[in-house]
């Protein structure tokens, strides 16, 4: 037996192949796309975009699978021909949605196209001539949903006690049929050895282990045809026109059709990254490799398997459950780049991931609006205010600027390494950590203070340039995820729509560039109508009636003087007296330690020094500040606030902060370095 090919994966950018071939699963055109389709295509698109930014020649293939029994039934039910049905679904429902989501595929293959039919028949004839396809009669359990024969072991018992193939509404049918079969088990030893020698071939590793378990038993032959008299909607076998090829040699070969039809070598299959859902693992991990082997083509480079998207409450999503997300409604209601960001940031390949409006709004507000959008607004605004809209040159760099430059130069390799490891969410977080550090840098540098003194103008220039160039670097690191907004960000910086490679670089923003400004990059969503109803719309709470005292016959009533009625209290105008204000004890406090509160996205636990006293304060400023950035900072504390427990931690005061309409937040402090415990009055 020939040794299986090796598939080295974690290659450095210098040793990677220049060519990069990626596919997303070919979608079955018998219904409209769901949120799982959306996630998969955004995932594959982000990987493709990252590789383009890294300078690789990318070929990205998608398409629709348009033959089969289910399509014939759906067309008959709708009163149209199968071709009319797939034309509508492929062009309107699928390609239309991918365009709205910014999916940057290079080829979109339809399996009803003439070029695809020709390639399928060419490969079938080649495998048939080699003796790996034969005619036989077979009886077994057939899943209409999966469009293949299944084994008893693959069935799962439902709540009603009926065993079904996962995802099917109906139990499998017992079918006996004479079809053509592919001698798949011939290549089982080769496939097993290949998987054992290439641990990164199928990722995440848990899915590779599933396939290894499958290969412990005889995989048997694969039925690849149906009688044309029963299923006429398919590609005829070139040696027997009474049969059509069914599913596998049709759908899976669609990954290669665009290459072959463009005159490229089908051996590009050996460079492919296939991105698929876990529900079609077996066809891609067992059927497809053995088909490639029989056709004399190299095995793909990597099979990327993603899990399912769940409802926000962790339940499975479905129309029957009333919690399905309509992708068309989603893109109509929310910014596309926010959808892309939230799905990629929240989901991880190895586990089913919850998603919904709450998740989307949280990421939109905290990451995109507060962190990235506000950084852009602040930077552009300060350049306009302090430098007439022109980005100055950095003239007085300190260790802090050199630290930011080093982080910026290291970021591209870190992002690409994480993408190669399929940790897309972590790659995004690496870029956003850089953004958050830029926000801390501005807060630490206080450019608004530097602007006041002639002696610190050079320092101000350096801070403004560092912020602008840092934003450019961040935009490139995030461009694969938020492609439209990344370009808009650079336009606001005055850099036009010029593209930049994802590589270690600093100083590519020319000093003297005039910023353009523009609309808020990621506006925060307006509250829903039912969230904005004020208390006046609610009926007043009923007042408790005072119990009336009665006078008994045995107790003489007392006579009392009639007191004049008290004057009506003046209407509350929101003002307080100086005496009221004097009750508030405001003090300077120094942060000596800070940490995030577990399982609380918004809270930080601060240990502050108040003169000789040490206190614990819990504050909801986590989305603006990293814990380590606050250590050593002096803040204003409400020192005589009644203690309150937050997440089981007693908070002994309140830190004062100011937030503008754009969501920029700054802690209240003093220009002088006053001792902790100093009273504010």
From Swiss-Prot:
GO terms for biological process: methionyl-tRNA aminoacylation. The keyword RNA-binding applies. Residues 580-681 form the tRNA-binding domain. It is an enzyme of class 6 (ligase). It is found in: Cytoplasm. GO terms for cellular component: cytoplasm. One of its GO terms (molecular function) is methionine-tRNA ligase activity. PROSITE patterns: TRBD. Residues 522-571 are annotated as: Disordered. Is required not only for elongation of protein synthesis but also for the initiation of all mRNA translation through initiator tRNA(fMet) aminoacylation. Homodimer. Belongs to the class-I aminoacyl-tRNA synthetase family. MetG type 2B subfamily. HAMAP family: Met_tRNA_synth_type2. This is Methionine--tRNA ligase. It comes from Deinococcus radiodurans (strain ATCC 13939 / DSM 20539 / JCM 16871 / CCUG 27074 / LMG 4051 / NBRC 15346 / NCIMB 9279 / VKM B-1422 / R1). The lineage of its organism: Bacteria, Thermotogati, Deinococcota, Deinococci, Deinococcales.
